[in-house]
């Protein structure tokens, strides 16, 4: 098992370009962020977006990045040091209990794309709390239908392993736990935002083989353990073997493609 420092480096090298950058690009293509004031980036990872925003501000504001992983924060701080970026700082902290006073930031950006659905409301409520009145809140997330191709073959693998009836209810929960776009917008309004709007993109992740998919850092570090929670521990190796077999059969010598429904939900406090 990877230690926390190795996981942080894997996050920076693999998960940021394969996953995070897609959501950050969606923000950059959909809206213009202010070039002055205070901006907070919650769950900032290894700091790329916060650093990019700070560089655009040319000394007219401050960007604060916060992340629960001290190892990722250390990588972000090292990047800022190399860039001699004095207008960005990074802190370790928990998104559901942000270490800031209310009404501190003109813009609050938060990454919920790797959170479970039941964790998003606490994150969003905290983002709204620390935003200034009339401040903008921007939430990155995935919506229902993400990884739909995987769940289809997962069902086949569970059936082949003789477990489909035992875990069907849990699998159905996994398939449906992500918010729909309308549910996400309604959540933003319940948390205190107005003028809520959303921007979406349909992304594809491509893997040459089942092994490439199941051993990709994005999958192993961020999703696979949750997917396998519904399977008894003693049966997981069998289910993984069935998954490899089903994926390689279904892809028919073509890449295994999975869809990510990326969304940015934004509103004004």
Predicted regions mapped to residue ranges:
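Conserved catalytic/acceptor-binding region of the Class I
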Residues: 121, 134-208
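A short SAM/SAH-binding and catalytic strip from SAM-dependent methyltransferases
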Residues: 106-120, 141
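Class I SAM-dependent methyltransferase Rossmann-like catalytic core
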Residues: 5-18
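Short glycine-dipeptide loop
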Residues: 36, 59-60, 131-136
